[in-house]
């Protein structure tokens, strides 16, 4: 049995852009998560390490990438078109864990339940439409 040293968590404070966040939220975009914000480090002995970011790490047009190491394949014009092509109607269910489950449906769950669509959990419906809160093929 080999013991490895415990590596502490590194926290990075990201600069906030309220205008961009409001634009993304209004158009239904959400970065995974959605938990309540708060300071979880209550112990006076726990050290909080912050890494300053340079201005060049985040592009001023709001295009960013999570994970990976390659450059973004979108230019600002394509990104703007993508945002404006999204429906303007609000999504059903709000933003949070329910919307996350609705948008990232596991492909292995096709239709494991039988019965009318109202009896299915939303995350298991193959043709569930989050905009109209309906299932295609059912009236």
Swiss-Prot record:
Cleaved by the viral protease during virion maturation. May cause the middle segment to be shed from the capsid. One of its GO terms (cellular component) is viral capsid. InterPro entries: Adeno_PVIII. The record marks 34-35 as: Cleavage. Residues 35-69 form a propeptide. GO terms for molecular function: hexon binding. Keywords: Capsid protein, Host nucleus, Late protein, Virion. Disulfide bonds: none annotated. Induction: Expressed in the late phase of the viral replicative cycle. It comes from the Viruses. All late proteins expressed from the major late promoter are produced by alternative splicing and alternative polyadenylation of the same gene giving rise to non-overlapping ORFs. A leader sequence is present in the N-terminus of all these mRNAs and is recognized by the viral shutoff protein to provide expression although conventional translation via ribosome scanning from the cap has been shut off in the host cell. Belongs to the adenoviridae hexon-linking protein family. Interacts with the peripentonal hexons as well as the hexons in the facets. Part of a complex composed of the core-capsid bridging protein, the endosome lysis protein VI and the hexon-linking protein VIII; these interactions bridge the virus core to the capsid. This is Pre-hexon-linking protein VIII.
């Amino acid at each position: 049995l080999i013991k490895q040293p415990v590596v502490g968590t590194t926290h990075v404070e990201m600069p906030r852009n309220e205008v961009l966040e409001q634009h993304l939220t209004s158009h239904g975009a959400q970065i995974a998560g959605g938990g309540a914000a708060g300071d979880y480090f209550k112990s006076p002995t726990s050290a909080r390490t912050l890494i300053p970011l340079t201005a060049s790490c985040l592009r001023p047009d709001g295009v960013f990438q999570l994970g990976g190491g390659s450059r973004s394949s979108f230019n600002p014009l394509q990104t703007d078109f993508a945002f404006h092509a999204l429906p303007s109607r609000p999504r059903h269910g709000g933003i949070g864990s329910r919307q996350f489950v609705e948008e990232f449906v596991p492909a292995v769950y096709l239709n494991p339940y039988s019965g009318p669509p109202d009896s299915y959990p939303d995350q298991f419906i193959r043709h569930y439409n989050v905009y109209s809160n309906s299932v295609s093929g059912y009236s």
